[in-house]
């Protein structure tokens, strides 16, 4: 029996891991082992929020060396990260300028300026990407306006996972799923939109050819293949979401919550634009028609501010609080990166004549209720786009462990919710590597392996969780916030 040892590097906005997947080519068992975990956080450079690339590279290599030093033969490596953030390289492959983080405030007001100059509908028809203030399009516009002197130094533009692959292999590869998060890829041709690049005043030569995942980029230390995976972590997570049928939706639940459909065609009509739906690239010729929701970022910040160490206990305390006393719009800009999340929530409730949550449990309940309400709203929008009701919701990622929020989601959306796998991005990363290693052929085949190896938990709508008239009142209150 042959065991393939596959390293999946999974970087998030607050932490990173090097995971080792062991895959049996005989019985198709997959096991996961965390080899190395490290913190990730913004670093301040000249008043801007940035990423420390040298630190990330060093931690990744530390994790890979731990595997090598354990005596196990490593068969391949893949890296996935968040989207939208990029690196500029000069002709020697050295980094030009800081590597800004998407929560940096330099893009404040830039999106509105670009929309006014180009036209919102024009941008959306070209790219199919939802309008978020930190999309790469607006980051680059801020850069060209503020630091035009850098332009003459730059030879290559790469996304962060492509940069890390380059550091491991010396080879530049521009991976499709992450490239689509930039709002610079034309959804009709799956290539860079030259008109948008011209608008920014940037040469097409910076950007190079986009390639789909599932192939070898190069070798680490001249011996271990580094594979191009679905390097946007959400794209990897969707690969491992064991969708029950074509009308099932997924919810990648973590720092961000991303709810969507796995489709063969993008949706860029006026209804999709008005709903701020995004059409990000997937694999096997599919698109991720989805919506970004601020997600557990709000809860994580609450726990940090209130020094919460026992998160399961706080979730239970929140469950015991009265429901729907305070509702917020989790996607409101004031929650993107406030100096105090507690104060931001309380101020929002004050401005919208809501009950002001004070205790940590009340604040947590406010967050969970509001997220579940927003999940319901997005599910209804997605159903409207596809012309069919959502049949089931598959919640994957770390947030799928929150049974209370899963149950709220089933109650409010009125459909069965299936939770798991927890390590969705890691598994999707592994799945792409297995495709590159010719062990499996497509996402559908890999999802069957996921179900066999990682049991799901099912949540059904409770028939009498709240009187219909009371809920309708709260639902109307929430919709008025959006």
Curated annotation (Swiss-Prot):
SS bond list: 349-366, 409-413
Gene Ontology terms describing biological process: glycerol metabolic process; rhamnose catabolic process
GO molecular function, one term: rhamnulokinase activity
InterPro entries reported in the protein's UniProt record: ATPase_NBD, FGGY_N, Rhamnulokinase
Coiled-coil region(s): none
Keyword terms of this UniProt record: ATP-binding, Disulfide bond, Kinase, Nucleotide-binding, Rhamnose metabolism, Transferase
Active site: 233
Reactions catalysed according to its record: L-rhamnulose + ATP = L-rhamnulose 1-phosphate + ADP + H(+)
Pathway: Carbohydrate degradation; L-rhamnose degradation; glycerone phosphate from L-rhamnose: step 2/3
Keyword Disulfide bond: yes
Listed GO CC annotations: cytosol
EC number(s) on file: 2.7.1.5
The protein's enzyme class: transferase
Listed NCBIfam families: PRK10640.1, rhamnulo_kin
Name this polypeptide is given: Rhamnulokinase
Organism: Mannheimia succiniciproducens (strain KCTC 0769BP / MBEL55E)
């Amino acid at each position: 029996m042959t065991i393939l040892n596959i390293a999946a590097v999974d970087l998030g906005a607050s932490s990173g891991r090097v995971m080792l997947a062991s895959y049996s080519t005989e019985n198709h068992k997959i096991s996961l082992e965390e080899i190395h975990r490290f913190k990730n956080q913004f670093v301040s450079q000249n008043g801007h929020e940035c990423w420390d690339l040298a630190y990330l590279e060093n931690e990744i290599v530390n994790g890979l060396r731990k595997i090598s030093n354990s005596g196990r033969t490593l068969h391949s490596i893949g890296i996935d990260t968040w989207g939208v953030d990029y690196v500029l390289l000069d002709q020697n492959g050295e980094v030009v300028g800081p590597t800004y983080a998407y929560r940096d405030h330099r893009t404040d007001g830039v999106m509105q300026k670009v929309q006014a100059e180009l036209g919102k509908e024009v941008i959306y028809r070209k790219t199919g990407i939802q309008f978020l203030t930190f999309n790469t399009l607006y980051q680059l516009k801020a850069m060209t306006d503020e630091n035009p002197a850098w332009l003459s130094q730059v030879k290559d533009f790469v996304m962060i996972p492509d940069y890390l692959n380059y550091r491991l292999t010396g080879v530049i590869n521009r991976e499709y799923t992450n490239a689509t998060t930039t709002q610079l890829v034309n959804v009709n041709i799956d290539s860079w939109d030259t008109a948008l690049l011209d608008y920014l005043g940037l040469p097409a030569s910076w950007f190079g050819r986009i390639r789909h995942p599932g192939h070898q980029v190069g070798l680490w230390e001249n011996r271990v293949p580094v594979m191009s995976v679905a390097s946007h972590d959400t794209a990897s997570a969707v690969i491992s979401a064991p969708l029950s049928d074509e009308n099932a939706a997924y919810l990648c639940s973590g720092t961000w919550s991303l709810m969507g459909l796995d489709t063969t065609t993008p949706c860029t009509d006026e209804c999709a634009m008005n709903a701020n739906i995004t059409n990000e690239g997937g694999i096997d010729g599919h698109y991720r028609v989805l919506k970004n929701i601020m997600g557990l970022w709000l809860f994580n910040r609450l726990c940090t501010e209130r020094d919460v160490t026992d998160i399961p206990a706080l979730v239970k305390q929140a469950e015991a609080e009265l429901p729907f006393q305070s509702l917020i719009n989790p996607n409101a800009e004031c929650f993107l990166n406030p100096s105090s999340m507690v104060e931001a929530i309380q101020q929002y409730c004050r401005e919208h004549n809501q009950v002001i949550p004070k205790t940590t449990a009340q604040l947590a309940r406010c967050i969970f209720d509001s997220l579940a309400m927003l999940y319901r709203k997005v599910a209804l929008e997605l159903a409207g786009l596809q012309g069919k009701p959502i049949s089931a919701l598959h919640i994957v990622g770390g947030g799928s462990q929150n049974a209370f929020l899963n149950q709220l989601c089933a109650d409010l959306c009125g459909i069965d919710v299936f939770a798991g796998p927890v390590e969705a991005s890691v598994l999707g990363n592994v799945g792409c590597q297995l495709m590159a290693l010719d062990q499996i052929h497509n996402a559908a085949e890999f999802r069957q392996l996921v179900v066999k190896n990682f049991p799901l938990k099912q949540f059904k709508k409770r028939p009498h969780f709240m009187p219909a008239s009371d809920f309708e009142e709260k639902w109307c209150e929430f919709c008025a916030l959006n």
